[in-house]
Structures are given as structure tokens and as C-alpha cells.
A protein has these predicted regions:
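Extended, folded cores of ATP/NTP-driven motor/assembly subunits in large transport
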Residues: 1-244
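Generic structural signal for short, flexible, solvent-exposed coil/loop and linker residues
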Residues: 162-164, 246, 257, 276
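Pre-P-loop entry segment of helicase/translocase ATPase cores
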Residues: 231, 236-265
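Glycine-rich phosphate-binding loop of nucleotide-binding enzymes
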Residues: 252-298
Length: 298
């Protein structure tokens, strides 16, 4: 699988080393950064963790959690990407991943977690066959049972006719702030971004500690099964966030540019590295900008 993804040329996978996960004496690892909610490369400050439902805290940081844990919360149609209106024109589209609103477009400290559980497909289909028969026998007592039985049959027909893989899926957004006013703002912003995806925002309070604990890197085995929903693999991967922040080029020379999203300076090689990766075939430059935009600095 790793070779297939890497050979595509679009994205690359790399297995993390043990020191990158657990850290060293000089640098914190991924687990330590997650438990302190800090991405600093310096040694993280030890902080108390309060796991009380409704008011979970890590040090001075108060956490809020929004989840996508039910098919009722999802839009009627999922896609791999969407048109970003701000950077699109009538002649060109700027395409971002479907979950971009809760990724880089969410302007606050947050973690977007995506879970896809690949269980035994045959057992899932057998369980749904049994549930379908039970709901059919109870359909005379409630119309909702008849509707659910019809939906289950549609799911089973899709699985058998197209041979798609049934999976369990869950997504959540953990955001945090240190003061009450900022906390209310990020809670509203997260809900608004989920609504932009045409999802129903579900603000969780009671199960925040459980889902935070399950989100520790390598600890997905503690994830509560009742927080996931059944779907197919194709629909589940539509909820992945495919964007990342700009990163400095590994080249020893380049130009300092500003990250368009956050204004952070980034070291960029605009000549050798793009040619090495096959993005460009020559080093010609064309600079376009109004008067006073800094063209002469190039």
C-alpha cells in the first residue's frame, strides 16, 4: 500500500520512527505534543489534565469537541473535493478537499481526527441482514421500522452489487482556548465550518474525555464503537482533509515568502527543487504585480 501511494507522485507516506513518536530528552515526540496540546519543538511544560465531562482542561486550555458520528449528521452527498469560492473565478476553480473547512480553513487551535475501522465485512453484512429481518417483522408496529428496513436493504444491495467495502467511520474536531470569550468564539466557528460542509454540527460535552483519550496516537483501540457509523470506504475517505501548511524547502538556498493562510515566513526553492520533482521543465520566471508590490526584490 505504501509503495502504491508513493508511486502516485501526489502524496508520500513515511513510517514514523520511535523517537518521533515517544520523543527524546531534547525534543518532545508526537504523544507528548498531543498530551500537552503544543506543537513546539522545545521540551513541553508538564500540565495537569482534567478529564471531567463538560469541562475538560489541559493546563489553562479548555477543550470543546464537535463530532460526525451519525449518518443523520452528514449531507445528502459526499465528494472528494469542493469549489473554494474565495480563490475561484468564473473561468477557473480552486478545488479543496471536502473537509478543508475543518482543516486549514478553521482559524483556531484545533485537531481534526478521522477514523476508518475496517472490520470483517462478511460479519457486518450478516449482522445487517439480521437487523433487516427484525425490522421487517416489527414494521407493522411502527412506520420508522419499515423505513429503516428499506434503508438497510439499500445498503446491502449496494454492497453486494458493486462489491464495495463496508466500514465504520468517525470524525471529530477538538479545539481549545484559554479564556471564556475565546472559547465561545472557537465553539461557534467550528460549528459554522461544519455547517459549511452541509453537516449538522454536533457539540459534545459528556464524551469529550473518552474521544480525546482514544485520539492519542496509537490508542485507537480504545475508541468507543457506539460513536461510529456504518458507511462504505469510498464515502469514508471523502471526509479526509488533504491540505497541509506550507513547509520550508530542504534546499540550502531559496527565497523567503509568506504563507498565504497565516502570513508565516517560509523558505522556498523556486528553481532546483521543482525541476527535480518534475513540476517544471525550465527555470524561466515571469513576475506579475502592480506598482509597489515588490517585483524588483525578485
Amino acid at each position: 500500500f505504501e509503495h502504491i501511494v508513493n508511486d502516485s507522485g501526489h502524496i508520500r507516506l513515511r513510517r514514523l520512527e520511535t523517537e518521533e513518536i515517544t520523543g527524546t530528552r531534547e525534543r518532545p515526540g508526537l504523544v507528548e505534543k498531543y498530551l500537552s496540546l503544543s506543537m513546539e519543538d522545545e521540551t513541553a511544560v508538564l500540565q495537569d489534565i482534567c478529564l471531567k465531562p463538560g469541562r475538560m482542561r489541559i493546563g489553562d486550555k479548555r477543550l470543546c469537541l464537535h463530532t460526525l458520528s451519525d449518518t443523520e449528521d452528514l449531507p445528502g452527498k459526499l465528494s472528494t473535493d469542493m469549489r473554494y469560492e474565495r480563490m475561484s473565478t468564473d473561468r477557473s476553480d480552486c478545488r479543496l478537499s471536502f473537509a478543508a473547512p475543518v482543516g486549514l480553513l478553521l482559524s483556531c487551535n484545533h485537531i481534526y481526527s478521522q477514523y476508518v475501522f475496517i472490520d470483517n465485512a462478511q460479519e457486518i453484512l450478516q449482522m445487517m441482514e439480521k437487523n433487516s429481518r427484525n425490522m421487517l417483522s416489527l414494521s407493522r408496529y411502527s412506520r420508522s421500522n419499515a423505513v429503516n428496513q428499506e434503508w438497510t436493504e439499500m445498503y446491502l444491495d449496494e454492497a453486494h452489487t458493486k462489491g464495495v467495502l463496508p466500514v465504520r467511520c468517525h470524525c471529530n474536531v477538538i479545539a481549545w482556548a484559554e479564556d471564556a470569550e475565546e472559547f465561545r468564539r472557537i465553539r461557534n466557528d467550528t460549528g459554522s465550518q461544519l455547517a459549511m460542509m452541509e453537516c449538522t454540527p454536533r457539540y459534545n460535552t459528556v464524551d469529550t474525555p473518552v474521544l480525546y483519550w482514544a485520539g492519542i496516537p496509537g490508542n485507537a483501540g480504545d475508541f468507543p464503537a457506539e460513536e461510529s457509523f456504518y458507511t462504505f470506504l469510498e464515502q469514508a475517505v471523502c471526509l479526509f482533509a488533504g491540505e497541509t501548511n506550507y513547509r520550508s524547502s530542504p534546499s540550502p538556498f531559496g527565497i523567503r515568502m509568506a504563507d498565504r493562510q497565516n502570513g508565516i515566513p517560509v523558505h522556498v526553492d523556486i528553481s532546483d527543487l521543482p525541476m527535480k520533482r518534475g513540476i517544471i521543465t525550465n527555470r524561466n520566471k515571469f513576475i506579475l504585480g502592480p506598482s509597489g508590490s515588490g517585483k524588483s526584490f525578485f
